[in-house]
Amino acid sequence: MNTQLLVTLLAMSIGGVALAAEIKMDDQSQLTQKAGKGAGESYFQPPQEKDLPANAYGELVQQGRAIFVDTQKYAAEYVGNGMNCTNCHLEQGRKANSAPLWGAYPMYPAYRKKNDKVNSYAERVQGCFQFSMNGTPPAADSHVINALTAYSYWLSTGAPTGQELPGRAYPEVPQPQGGFDIAKGKQIYAEQCAVCHGDDGQGQKAGGGYVFPPLWGKDSFNWGAGMHRINTAAAFIKESMPLGKGGSLSDADAWHVAAYMNSHERPQDPRLIEGSVEKTRLKYHANDGVNLYGQQVDGALLGQGVK
């Protein structure tokens, strides 16, 4: 992180002590929000690239954007699957209701139940590499983390610190009465999703890289990623999928297809305890939203992982 940015962040953190009572420090592991904006609310508007300064800071922001959009290329040594950051945080981390960076950065440091401690923003990004990217977290002072932090900081220009902005999460989608139906989800997947992600959920490649990410299997996110939760995946799908047709699926259909997606095997949770899926389920998954880790589906135990 360059000196000017570090000084700015330090000043912000010191200045924020007096406002600590106003800043919500609740669990940031699993964000929820009601769909849409409240009366009189509007979404935060991040700055445009044309407004970037032509200096070292602007260059670092551009490098962070490049890593975010093409993580496979610019942070390859830390990625263990076929995902890019922008696969989950759409429109280069700008899109409201898709966990935008401008909604996340101002909320850190924050407590996360996932690792039971207050996390810095760098630690939050490291977690994405470990779970969503099924890779190795870059060091907190690495160029990759510094660049991604600078990009997030820049997108948050003008955003209030410690305030939950409208659009910062995936809007919560209520579970259908009677629960999800994996068989229905399979049919919906074939009709709505397979054209991009493939009949087998393995995505599509062009020029050696994925243009549509794999949704399960060895090149997808692992069992520790937030998207393995059916409720989180349903919220993402309802809001933004199929691509360009967000909101076209019913709440129930979003749940059904999310359950189908997450009823397939994927890379192991890196927090695996003593080689035991059951011990790992009890410690990390039993109270983590709605998920199928450690559950039997069609006679198979999910959570054994693929390599």
Swiss-Prot record:
Which leading EC class covers this enzyme? oxidoreductase
Alphabetically ordered keywords of this record: Heme, Iron, Metal-binding, Oxidoreductase, Periplasm, Repeat, Signal
Q: How is it modified after translation?
A: Binds 2 heme c groups covalently per subunit.
Catalysed reaction(s) here are:
2 thiosulfate + 2 Fe(III)-[cytochrome c] = tetrathionate + 2 Fe(II)-[cytochrome c] + 2 H(+)
Provide the binding site for heme c 1: C85, C88, H89
Question: Key word Metal-binding present in the record?
Answer: yes
Q: Name one GO cellular component term.
A: periplasmic space
Kindly list the positions annotated as binding heme c 2.
C193, C196, H197
PROSITE patterns in UniProt? CYTC
Q: What is its EC number?
A: 1.8.2.2
Principal place of residence = periplasm
Q: What happens to activity at different temperatures?
A: Optimum temperature is 20 degrees Celsius.
- Per the UniProt entry, the signal peptide is 1-20
Q: What does this protein do?
A: Catalyzes the oxidation of 2 molecules of thiosulfate to tetrathionate, using TsdB as an electron acceptor.
How this chain assembles, per its entry, is: Monomer.
| Name of the protein | Thiosulfate dehydrogenase
Q: Which organism is the protein's source? A: Stutzerimonas stutzeri (strain A1501)
